[in-house]
Regions:
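Bacterial lipoprotein signal-peptidase II cleavage site
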Residues: 21-35
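Extracytoplasmic "Venus flytrap"
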Residues: 51-83, 105-112, 134-135, 204-213, ...
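Sec-dependent bacterial lipoprotein signal peptides
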Residues: 1-22
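Beta-alpha junction/loop-to-helix N-cap segments that form part of ligand/metal-binding clefts
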Residues: 4, 25, 73-80, 92-165, ...
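Signal peptide-proximal N-terminal region
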Residues: 80-102, 194-196, 223-226
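Extracytoplasmic ligand/sensor domains, especially the bilobed periplasmic-binding protein
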Residues: 126-232, 284-308
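Extracellular/periplasmic periplasmic-binding protein-like sensory domains
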Residues: 274-350, 361, 417-422, 428-433
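Segments of small-molecule ligand-sensing domains
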Residues: 334-346, 357-414
Length: 434
């Protein structure tokens, strides 16, 4: 794309923003939702507006989500989180008196498609604002495109170091930096009494920018505590048959197992192999998958196989935050299920909307340059995941790391030990099917 063409597109986008701002003032309301099911397809729909916003131009927010492909489960959860936020912001008066409309395009979990999608959302659809996609894998390429157009890029699932290694000033992750995810778990194992502490541990992780950065610090903590790492393997992200890897882990009889997973199928495959191999580690944590509620339980054969399994994160359905509990209740009312079915993806997406709304309201503007400057100002904002304060890179330095464990069909906060809301860790992990 030529420089002159890019300037023309930016001018067009600014003109669209100006048109909306011309009518902006107080608060109004509407509800909105949108969905897309195929790569490159886009659908946007608005709910009924209240009398105060019914005749006002909507503010359109674009995003690319993985509604199919490898990240479909997470992408669909993100879509629900964005929709819940849009419904709530519109019910509360919209943004600057205008209803919000979501413009969602499916990227089919493809790094190349996500680039095409954000280019379309900004240069063709002229959406005034954009939200981030799911995963660091898709955040890295899309952030470069969004930066080229001068847009703020607030996201909730691109917390790996790779997302912040390009010197971009427009990217902001509302969630916990993934590099800290496994620290509470590693510290807990390392500080167990010597008679209870595992003597061996196995590590297997996908070659993914989300999973790999979580392990170096955790492994070092375990080794410093005298825990021997008897298996440490990085497997290709393209792997679909995990049986050989899981069998190799089981053969070590390691007393603790740390899995770098990005989805439910990965964890499910390991668990089913472990059951077949009669391998039951005293402690088992997976970086993603166990946080997926009903989808996880169904994939592994029910709650009895989930008992004692752990997952790191910065949020869970029982998080003691009034806004979080309201969101969980709204999710259950709209989509059914129980609070345990509301996974962290929903909260991450909802938080993105909250932070963007606070920035828009604080700056009284849809000017992306003003929003970027505000988010870099050191202000502390609030979300359903807790406080948000961005450092110079755009990472959330106020986020806290926790670990959660499935106990009696409920995902409970258990780490850090002694933290508000933490329950006793179930250790050793019960046998599969117990």
């Amino acid at each position: 794309m030529t420089r002159s063409r890019r300037r023309a597109l930016i001018v067009a986008a600014v003109a669209a923003v100006a048109a909306v701002l011309a009518g902006c003032g107080g608060s109004g309301s509407s509800s909105s939702a949108s969905s897309a099911s195929s790569s490159g397809s886009s659908t946007a729909a608005s709910g009924s507006a209240t009398s105060s916003t019914a005749n006002k131009t909507p503010i359109t927010i674009g995003t690319s989500l993985s509604l199919s492909g490898d990240f479909a489960s997470d992408g669909q959860a993100f879509e629900k989180g964005y929709q819940l936020w849009a419904n709530d912001i519109n019910a509360a008066g919209g943004l600057m008196g205008h209803p919000v409309k979501l413009d969602i395009i499916s990227d089919a979990s493809s790094p190349s498609q996500v680039v095409t999608n954000y280019t379309k959302l900004i240069s063709s659809d002229h959406d005034q604002l954009v939200f981030g996609p799911f995963s660091t894998l898709l955040t890295v390429p899309s952030s470069k495109v969004v930066n080229r157009y001068g847009y703020a890029f607030v996201e909730g699932a691109g917390g790996a170091p790779a997302a912040f290694g390009n010197g971009l000033k427009n990217i902001f992750d509302v969630s916990l930096p993934v590099i800290d995810n496994l620290i509470p778990f590693a510290h807990w194992l390392a500080t167990l009494p010597a008679s209870e502490r595992p003597t061996t541990a196995a590590v297997a992780t996908s070659d993914d920018p989300f999973t790999q950065p979580q392990f170096p610090a955790a492994v070092k903590i375990l080794q410093n505590a005298g825990i021997k790492i008897v298996y440490n393997k990085v497997f290709p992200a393209e792997v679909t048959d995990y049986t050989p890897i899981a069998t190799a882990v089981a053969s070590t009889k390691a007393q603790a197992f740390l899995l770098g997973s990005v989805d439910v199928p990965t964890v499910s495959a390991f668990i089913h192999t472990f059951i077949q191999q009669h391998y039951n580690p005293k402690a088992f944590i997976a970086t993603a998958g166990p946080d997926q509620g009903a989808a996880f339980l169904k994939a592994i054969g029910g709650p009895s196989n989930a008992e004692g399994v752990m997952v790191p994160n910065g949020w869970f359905p029982g998080y003691p935050n009034a806004a979080s509990q309201k969101m969980v209740s709204e999710y259950v009312a709209k989509y059914g299920g129980s609070p345990s079915d509301v996974n962290a993806d929903v909260a991450e997406a909802y938080s993105v909307g909250q932070i963007v709304a606070q920035a828009v309201n604080a700056t009284h503007s849809l000017d992306n340059s003003k929003i970027i400057a505000y988010l870099h100002s050191g202000v502390t904002l609030n979300s359903v995941q807790g406080p948000v304060k961005f450092d110079s890179l755009g990472e959330n330095g106020a986020a806290a790391a926790f670990a959660f464990q499935w106990q009696k069909s409920v995902l409970e906060q258990v780490l850090p030990v002694g933290a508000t809301g933490s329950k006793p860790v179930e250790y050793p992990k019960p046998n599969w099917g117990s």
